[in-house]
Amino acid sequence: MSTPLLLLVFLGGAVATWLAGVELSKTTDALDRRLGFGEELGGLILLAVAGSLPEVAITVSAALGGNLDLAAGNLIGGIVTQTMVLVVCDLFARRPLTFLVGSLIPVLEGLLVIVVVSLVLLGGLLPASVAIGGVVSPSSIAIVLVWTAGIVVVDRVRRNAKWEVVMHGAQPGRPHHRMKVPNVPLPHEQKSTASIALRFGVACVVTLGAGVALELTGNGLADRAGVNGVVLGATFLALATALPEISSGIEAVRLGDNQLAVGDIFGGNAFQVCLFLPADLIAGTPVLPLAGRLNAWLASVGIVLTAIYTMGIVVRAERPARLGPDSILALVVFALGIAGLVRLS
């Protein structure tokens, strides 16, 4: 396949990912209302898992092809890129996004991200010989167990919080009462639950197919350009696979579901590192010990960015400019992180 055709297919996959992300946001919003999941759990499970389908496709395809550096780079680099989606969401919010969240549950979600990404770093320090059955890294299993426990904790706290938080001026959206946005109708309000679920499933299939196209064409373009697999996974592929989070995050903010916008990002980041377990099984060897210092650097940057926004929810600072202070700080850290990645590579 010629380079222009590869580029065209790559861009087509990116566009399909974006459009599917918009539909995922709308259908998840509608399913949350119909099924009563509540905002944070919906963002953590439904939209997070569906939004991670490109990463699922890329991880499976890369592991089958033995491109383990690309698989690891996309999973870890995606955390950095997707956290920066909160900067984009901040641009569309009337006040700083972390000011509007008005709940400590996203703080729990942020802490969950920090813990599972820390396990990624620990897994990278283990030798490949330390593996269950010679195939699976103990860290990969620990990540899945911690993520599952985190889901349970978030749900229990959401249903029966031991504390009451009063944040004046907050406009979280669901589950307490939807923030009213003039002239913005609720998505799929007149459709049946079965119809909404079908549209959700179709959007998931499109997202998954687009992820396969992105991996195949992205890998081909990288080979021709001589780009390192980690750098490719952490930059162009991570940006392309973050398109569902960008589209769904903007849509959530537009609908007034500010907690969902944050829950989408934190939930997706926490879930996608669970994909190291299937990557181990498919590759037949632990992937994390092969991640290298570039991925360790990216994971560290991801932890710092997550901590910035987690603290921002508690501090609730007003914006000095078009962006909140946490988003401004995140931009600085991101720029330094990319500069460091280029330097290390």
What are these regions (language model features)?
Residues 1-345:
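Hydrophobic alpha-helical segments, chiefly the membrane-spanning helices
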